[in-house]
From Swiss-Prot:
The keyword Transferase applies. It is found in: Cytoplasm. This is Serine hydroxymethyltransferase. Keywords: Amino-acid biosynthesis, Cytoplasm, One-carbon metabolism, Pyridoxal phosphate, Transferase. The gene is glyA. One of its GO terms (biological process) is glycine biosynthetic process from serine. (6S)-5,6,7,8-tetrahydrofolate binds at L115, G119, H120, L121. Homodimer. The keyword Transferase applies. SUPFAM superfamilies: PLP-dependent transferases. Catalyzes the reversible interconversion of serine and glycine with tetrahydrofolate (THF) serving as the one-carbon carrier. This reaction serves as the major source of one-carbon groups required for the biosynthesis of purines, thymidylate, methionine, and other important biomolecules. Also exhibits THF-independent aldolase activity toward beta-hydroxyamino acids, producing glycine and aldehydes, via a retro-aldol mechanism.
């Protein structure tokens, strides 16, 4: 058996490692997992087929797999105060797919946040499986505040009388009132599902309200702010447990990825610590520090600021450049972010009027408020003065900041 990584793969791996070490990562959905999670992702568990659930497998030799998955299930339930947990979904999208299957029939009506307002593809976008399987109607944000308008959401729900309401977003920077969503759902007898993929780590840390208190089903990814192996997780009330499990296997998936389930379990255990609670608090502090610097230097923030881990910046109205161009400028100096639509955007999705910035990854590396103030000033300078001389100077500042907060020093491929 070959024991060496292919030379071309090794070369790319080492270049990617160097990129991660030397760049400031501000993509809101990215993070740096612990070396324990990395090790588990590449463990011998990848060899094992384990269709089914702990104690009810369709393959032999699963006793140790069962131990790990059972630990993950129990940890998820305790961490999020859930009656039931399924940690097998391969992704957040597949978690959402299974949640829909557990609650709905094809063509049932759903009300969710529109993609242009900050929602997600799996919340009914027409060319996504969700959009062509179910009958979605959408709510957005108030045009003046760019925040959720619960009175307007209630009117939309009363008009369309959905079977399911989806709360949650991929680009919304304010606290979501899950209690209010539950009250609205109850008025039409609808189920409430919350997609907390972006904020799960903040919920675990106690710095964002826990949707499990109000929702029938909660879905999430296990990476992003939760800082785990890539994958999905479903939490629900006990009355939906059987339907959820059946919707995942055999409804949506076959064999679970037990190496990633081990990585998820490790991350859930890490998220149960006091250290992680402090991490969650620091994410929010860092976001506010970055937001303040950007605002003080004339950049307009969508919704007026942030309560969580991300900031949506309206680049077009303040600097007359697209989000795509801003993304490329920042990447040229070693700051990685993504172009992003903003509410009521007039630009096409490939160009956008905004960029989305997130603090989780660099908070993992040890950045605090002072470092994020520096990052904010670098961003402003790069976008306002795109001269080669200035960008070269700023790129050196980025490298200097990264060198003060090293990551994965012991890894070499």
């Amino acid at each position: 058996m070959n024991t060496k990584i292919n030379s071309k793969i090794r070369e790319s791996l080492n270049k990617e490692l160097k990129r991660q070490q030397s760049h400031i990562e501000l993509i809101a959905s990215e993070n740096y997992v612990s070396q324990a999670v990395l090790e588990l992702n590449g463990s011998v568990l990848t060899n094992k087929y384990a269709e089914g659930y702990p104690g009810k497998r369709y393959y032999g030799g699963c006793e140790f797999i069962d131990e790990i998955e059972s630990l993950g299930i129990q940890t998820a339930k305790e961490l999020f105060h859930a009656e039931h947990a399924n940690i097998q979904p391969h992704s957040g999208s597949q978690a959402n797919d299974a949640a829909y299957k557990a609650l709905l029939e094809p063509k049932d009506r759903v009300v969710a946040m529109g993609l242009d307002a900050g929602g997600h593809l799996t919340h009914g976008y027409p060319i996504n499986f969700s959009g062509y399987t179910y009958d979605f109607r959408f709510y957005g944000v108030n045009k003046d505040t760019e925040q959720l308008d619960y009175q307007e959401i209630e009117q939309i729900v009363l008009e369309h009388k959905p079977k399911l309401i989806v709360a949650g977003a991929s680009a919304y920077s304010r606290i979501i009132d899950f209690k209010k969503f539950k009250e609205i759902a109850d008025k039409v007898g609808a189920y409430l599902m919350v997609d907390m993929a972006h904020i799960a780590g903040l919920v675990a840390a106690g710095v964002h309200p826990n949707p499990m208190e109000y929702a029938d089903i909660v879905t999430t990814t296990t990476h992003k702010t939760l800082r785990g192996a890539r994958g999905g997780l479903i939490l629900c009330k006990q009355e939906f447990a059987k339907k959820v499990d059946s919707a995942v296997f055999p409804g949506s998936q076959g064999g679970p990825l037990e190496n990633l389930i081990a990585g998820k379990t490790q991350a859930l255990l890490e998220a149960s610590t006091d250290e992680f609670k402090e991490y969650g608090k620091q994410i929010v502090k860092n976001t506010k520090a970055l937001a303040n610097v950007l605002q003080e230097n004339g950049l307009r923030l969508v919704a007026g600021g942030s309560d969580n881990h991300l900031i949506n910046v309206d680049i077009k109205s303040t600097l007359q450049i697209t989000g795509k161009k801003a993304e490329k400028i920042l990447e040229s100096i070693g700051i990685i972010c993504n172009k992003n639509m903003i509410p009521f955007d007039t630009e096409k999705p490939f160009y956008t009027s905004g960029i989305r910035l997130g603090t989780p990854a660099m908070t993992t590396r040890g950045f605090k408020e002072e470092e994020f103030k520096q990052v904010g000033l670098i961003i402003v300078s790069a976008l306002k003065d795109q001269s080669e001389e200035n960008l070269e100077k700023l790129a050196k500042q980025v490298v200097s900041l990264c060198e003060k907060f090293p990551i994965y020093q012991s890894i070499k491929y």
